[in-house]
């Protein structure tokens, strides 16, 4: 869908699928984006992913993910129960927030990945945006 929309608007975009942790090196691009994936990784895997993204990015990396906090967990619990009757949704949403990193943790992981001058901002709903510019 993204590729189709970009082509309709004459925007150059390349999407690729790969093993994020052990696959071949990422192709070089101006910006490498990771969205709602980091919370599925442990600390070492997150560091590996950030290193691989930084190596491939010519300009910047962006990581948008869930932020673990008491408030976010409760908001997701309420929203999942109000908006869905699925027991999978009721369990998956809060569990994903519980498994996510908080902002100080993701900053520390970025530091361990060798990223300097990382910026982390709160984003709605229940997320943060980590940005690093080379």
Per-region residue spans from a language model:
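Class I SAM-dependent methyltransferase SAM/SAH-binding core
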Residues: 1-23
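Short, conserved active-site loop motifs that form the nucleotide-linked donor/cofactor pocket
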Residues: 12-14, 30, 118
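Short conserved loop adjoining the S-adenosyl-L-methionine
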Residues: 22-27, 43
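A conserved beta-strand element that flanks and buttresses the S-adenosyl-L-methionine
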Residues: 33-34
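Hydrophobic adenine-recognition pocket in adenosine-nucleotide-binding enzymes
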Residues: 37
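Conserved beta-strand signature within the Rossmann-like core of class I S-adenosyl-L-methionine
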Residues: 50-68
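C-terminal alpha-helical "lid/dimerization" subdomain adjacent to the S-adenosyl-L-methionine
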Residues: 66-119
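C-terminal lobe and adjacent flexible extensions of AdoMet/dcAdoMet transferase-like proteins
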Residues: 128-134
């Amino acid at each position: 869908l993204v590729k189709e929309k970009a082509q309709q608007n004459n925007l150059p975009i390349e999407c690729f699928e790969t093993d994020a942790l052990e696959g071949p090196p990422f192709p070089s691009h101006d910006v490498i984006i990771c969205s709602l994936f980091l919370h599925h990784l442990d600390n070492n895997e997150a560091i590996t992913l950030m290193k691989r993204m930084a190596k491939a990015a010519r300009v910047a990396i962006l990581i948008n993910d869930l932020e673990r906090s008491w408030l976010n967990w409760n908001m997701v619990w309420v929203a999942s129960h109000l908006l869905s009757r699925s027991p999978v949704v009721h369990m998956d949403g809060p569990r994903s927030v519980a498994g996510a990193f908080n902002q100080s943790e993701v900053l520390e992981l970025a530091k361990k990945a060798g990223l300097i001058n990382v910026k982390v901002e709160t984003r709605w709903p229940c997320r943060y945006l980590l940005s690093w510019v080379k």
